[in-house]
Amino acid sequence: MDRQPIISAKDVEITFSLRGKKLKAIRKCSLDLYDGETLAIVGESGSGKSVFTKTFVGMLDVNGKITGGSILYEGRDMTKFTEKDWLGIRGKKIAMVMQDPMTSLNPLKKIGKQIQESIEHHQGLHGEAAKKAAIEMLAKVGIPDPERRYEQYPHEFSGGMRQRVVIAIAAACRPQILICDEPTTALDVTIQAQILQLIRDLQKELGMSVIYITHDLGVVANVADRVAVMYAGQIVEYGTVEEIFYDAWHPYTWALLQALPQLGTKGEALPTIDGTPPNLFNEIKGDAFAPRNKHALAIDFVAEPPFFQVSETHAAKTWYLDPRAPKMERPHSIQNLREKMGKMGGSNFNG
């Protein structure tokens, strides 16, 4: 790509100190985010998705530390930021929607005041002007009767409405980048679709770039322009949404795609990924996914694969792409995935 990224993470490493031991949660992750795009970071729980992206807003837990790499934003390395530096970035330029809206909201404070605080802090509005902006934001995220709702508390809102409030707080300052950490968890399918459409509408109106953190490839298909797949603290494959769904190469990506709901034979066992992710307290030798991969190559257990370029926009960290490797066939269930998704009405990506 000729265009310049607005965030460029290079070889980022993050280590946590736990009970006197070191846990390497992120292992040399590199990722670019471009202006106006929607990037999905997908993987199992514990893969490092949230930890990695929290570095973009300076919100690592106190026992976590960036121990390698760089994250460039506006020509500055965010790994070197002080808390004073973050005050001009967090919320104002890069905002984050957390997974659980109930824990993101103060139960003792009225909803309107919580949105108003964000506006006062980052936009410099005060009094009636800030209140008016907060009410307008409630209306913008689809909350009916915003003047009345402004005076209510979080417990008076449904889960879907609370998520709209959290999105309103994040978007109130018109950030350049919005990070959404599992924004539709625990919401029913209808509300999930409404929340995704809301974020899409706000992105278009405000010109934001959006990062989705999710384990749900169904969400990815609906929202993403590009996808990065994470496993055991590493990005193992990245590409456009079409490349990841229809031309994936990493065996972990294959396993995730196999777990997509499909029209199958009645009584057929649902696919699962055998085994468990590696213990990140221990040094990982070779390909981290090899012990769970039924078709692992001998080299997978002894040497970590590099990234092999599939196209200008697509690369995968797997020995399967080495010219010397035996030819590997994709699992039968994800062959002709374009046709199968079309039959289920899910072939139209990102909209």
What are the language-model segments listed below?
Residues Q4-P5, P144-R148, T240-G345:
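Short catalytic/signature loops enriched in Gly
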Residues V42-E44:
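The feature captures the beta-strand-to-loop junction immediately N-terminal to the Walker
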Residues G58, I179, P183, L187, ...:
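P-loop NTP-binding/switch modules centered on Walker-like glycine-rich loops
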Residues I66-D77:
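Conserved ABC transporter NBD signature motif
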Residues D77, A129-R148, L257:
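Conserved ABC ATPase "signature" region
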Residues A172-Q176:
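A short, proline-enriched helix->beta-strand linker immediately N-terminal to the Walker B motif
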